[in-house]
Structures are given as structure tokens and as C-alpha cells.
């Protein structure tokens, strides 16, 4: 058996997230279908992380086991022919037998682009979020700083009684480019919708809608 590692990128607009769901178009479902068409066998995909509906990815790692003793390039070129335009196979390589995408050490970085001006171009409507309220840069930077570190993020995620809500956020950075804000969140992993909730909290703090002390108390 060969262990094949794939690096994928996708436009999440038409996907209901990464994880397979019944009667939904998902990244895992489309990718698994292509792999099974190629190999002729049922295949289990293992992913380094999962994205929510509408979330895009530039470099996500997936691996699977196969009986086919092909070189990596054969998987790369043939799978590319089977995938739709909104799902790209960036690379393929033969990994060591013990490699497991989910448990391999890695960092995940989410990027949110917020337009704080009067409009978003139609060509950017799936990748840029419009937020027209005036923002105080000092407040959003302080809010970002308070979200860094190890905290209980239950208030910043979808409730799940079976999952530990403690996470360590390595960095939250905010870059301003004129009326545009680029927020980046880096951690070993995130809870369901945690990054969306943190982004919302930062923006609310920036417009003075929530107090920074209340933000800290929620952690």
C-alpha cells in the first residue's frame, strides 16, 4: 500500500464545507469521488483540518492509502483531470507509511479580508466582507491581542458539549491597507466557526459596541 499526500486549494463558494454531508456538495465528497474513480476502490480521506461552508483554502493537506504502485506525478495529473474548476490539486507525493494528515504537526492560518469603505467590488463579493461602521484601529489591535494565547473559547464557537473548548491561538495580526483590513489567525487548530466569531468580536470592539473588558471576560 502507498500513502499519498495531496495538497489542495479550492474556492469554497459552491461547497458546503470540507466534511462530507448527506445531499450536499462538499470538498471531501468531490475529492473522494475523483480518487475512487481513479483507483477503482473505496477510499478514506484524512484531512489536516476542516473548513466551513463558503470558506476558501489555499493549501490544505489530505492523505489516503492506495493499492496502486504509481509515481506521485501519475496521481497528480490524472486526478487533476477528474476535479472541477473550483478544486485544484496543487501537488501529490508519496508519503512515509506513518504519515497522518490530521495528527502531523502543523499550523493553520485563516485570513479574513474586511472592506471598511463604502463598497465591495462585485468580483470580490465571495472573498471580501463589507463592514461600513467606523473602526478605531487602537481598539481592534487591542482586541486582537487579547484573543491570543490559551483560553476557553466556548463563547467564540458553536456549542459542542463533547469537545474541549480550550485552544491556543498563536497569533492574531491585523494589517490595514487604506480602507481594507486583513486579519490573520494562526493556531494548531480551531473550534467550529471560532475564527468567524473572533473576527466579529474584533469588529464589534473596534466600533465600540462591546467593551474590551467584556471581551476578556468571555475567554
Regions found by a protein language model. Name each.
Residues 1-219:
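Structured-RNA-binding interfaces characteristic of tRNA pseudouridine synthases
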